[in-house]
Amino acid sequence: MRRLQRRIVQAQQQGKKRKVRALQFILTRSYSARCLAVRRVVENPGRRTPGVDGQILDTPEKKAQAVEKLSAEDYKAQPLKRVYIAKKNGRGRRPLGIPTMEDRARQALHLLALEPVAETTADPNSYGFRKERSVADAIEQCFILLARSTSPQWILEGDIQSCFDHAC
């Protein structure tokens, strides 16, 4: 599976879009990728939180069934289970949508196929929510850029978090 992901990266770098799609198709149907997707779901901290169907993958038999279900072509996503959790500031609650285990596994499977392309085409100076990148990497890059003789003399900091609370 890792080899397939490397081939997807190479095809993306060469601009071979049809080959990328073909390799992604192969990857999403491979048994090892389906097993890994289910494994990621059952090893996730939210593994004991069922969706609207009430199912959790707590036995080897259920995990094997989930792997087989991922090969089905007649997939239709289930509605999300809506739960309200308290906000950090203590004022009000925010909605949280919880997908079923099957939906989570399918999302994990497609992430395996899409991530090589996303990481290949992403901005090299983007550090948020990226695999193999951390806050420490972003800080290190800031120090490297600011250590130059042509670096800016001022750094401005702004807090725009509250701007997103009222988005439509």
Feature names for model-found ranges:
Residues 1-46, 112-128:
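Charged boundary/loop elements
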Residues 7-8, 66, 142:
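Generic hydrophobic alpha-helical segments
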Residues 10-13, 28, 95-100, 128, ...:
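Short, charged/polar micro-motifs that form catalytic or ligand-binding hotspots
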Residues 15, 70-71, 143, 147:
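Inter-domain linker/hinge segments that demarcate the starts of reverse transcriptase
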Residues 20-88, 93-94, 99:
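Phosphate/adenylate-binding "loop-and-lid" substructures adjacent to NTP/NAD/dNTP-binding pockets
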Residues 87-90, 94-120:
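Hydrophobic alpha-helical hairpins/lids featuring a short glycine-rich hinge
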Residues 107, 114-166:
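Active-site-proximal segment of RNA-dependent polymerases
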